[in-house]
């Protein structure tokens, strides 16, 4: 996976979903600590893992974790791990579900602080997924409000100055499509801090490239696009390149690249 990512670009920030620790069923009996593997294979990068699931194994002898990861060679100013809503879907059909999380990492980009958010939303329940999408947008708006109206600070304490910014990138496996209500909620207009689908910034109204079910049809008959980059109003002019590798089969999702100038 990392080799494929590096073939796409000499990246500064890497966002990964479905990263696990001690789930041999998921890792196919390979090295069980995937965040450690990423750190080992990316010298010069800092690796931050957000566990949506952190539980004791069934045998009671070790911990199991599952979540998202951000690796970057840029200076990292702050890291937050935010649990997303987990509402009861209230449906007759009983489906699997789990807690979801959004990692919010602020890095120092060449032009200033940049908030990078990565997540993996609910797959089965549209009710849960929509609530989580709204929460991701709200996190962005909350960060922008703090930048617009900074709090009083106290040096040398947890209240010390923070790298406040309105520049936001939100990416990940959203498990919704471009014509969904969830996508509409993500890009709902805001007076000053609207989010935009980065693909459409370069390609107008063209359909987003398929990123899921191209080669593995376990979860449906047709390929769909559900892995997006959203950028803030303040950042949309920096969108320079967007690419999807639709040739690789290293994952059931295709890797997506965003380049900012």
Model-derived segments and their meaning:
Residues 31-37, 41, 50-51, 134-135:
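Preference for well-ordered, secondary-structure-rich cores of eukaryotic proteins
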Residues 21-33, 57-60:
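Short, flexible/disordered intra-domain loops and linkers
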Residues 19, 52-54:
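Short linear capping/connector segments at secondary-structure termini
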């Amino acid at each position: 996976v990392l080799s494929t990512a590096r073939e796409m670009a000499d990246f500064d920030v890497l966002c990964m979903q479905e990263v696990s620790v001690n789930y041999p069923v998921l890792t196919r009996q390979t090295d069980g600590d995937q965040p450690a593997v990423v750190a080992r294979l990316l010298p010069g990068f800092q690796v931050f893992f957000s566990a949506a699931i952190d539980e004791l194994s069934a045998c009671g002898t070790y911990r199991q974790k599952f979540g998202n990861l951000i690796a970057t060679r840029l200076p990292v100013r702050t890291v937050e791990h935010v649990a997303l809503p987990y509402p009861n879907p209230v449906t007759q059909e009983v489906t699997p579900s789990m807690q979801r999380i959004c990692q919010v990492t602020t890095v120092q980009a060449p032009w200033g602080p940049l908030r990078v958010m990565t997540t993996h939303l609910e797959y089965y329940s549209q009710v849960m997924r929509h609530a989580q999408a709204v929460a991701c947008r709200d996190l962005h708006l909350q960060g922008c409000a703090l930048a617009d109206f900074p709090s009083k600070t106290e040096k040398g304490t947890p209240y010390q100055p923070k790298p406040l910014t309105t520049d936001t990138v939100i990416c990940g496996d959203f498990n919704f499509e471009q014509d969904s209500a969830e996508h509409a909620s993500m890009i709902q207009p805001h007076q000053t801090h609207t989010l935009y689908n980065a693909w459409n910034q370069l390609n107008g109204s063209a359909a987003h490239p398929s990123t899921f079910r191209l080669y593995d049809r376990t979860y449906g008959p047709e390929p769909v696009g559900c892995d997006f980059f959203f950028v803030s109003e303040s950042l949309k002019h920096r969108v320079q390149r967007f690419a999807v590798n639709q040739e690789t089969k290293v994952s059931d999702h295709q890797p997506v690249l965003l380049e900012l100038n």
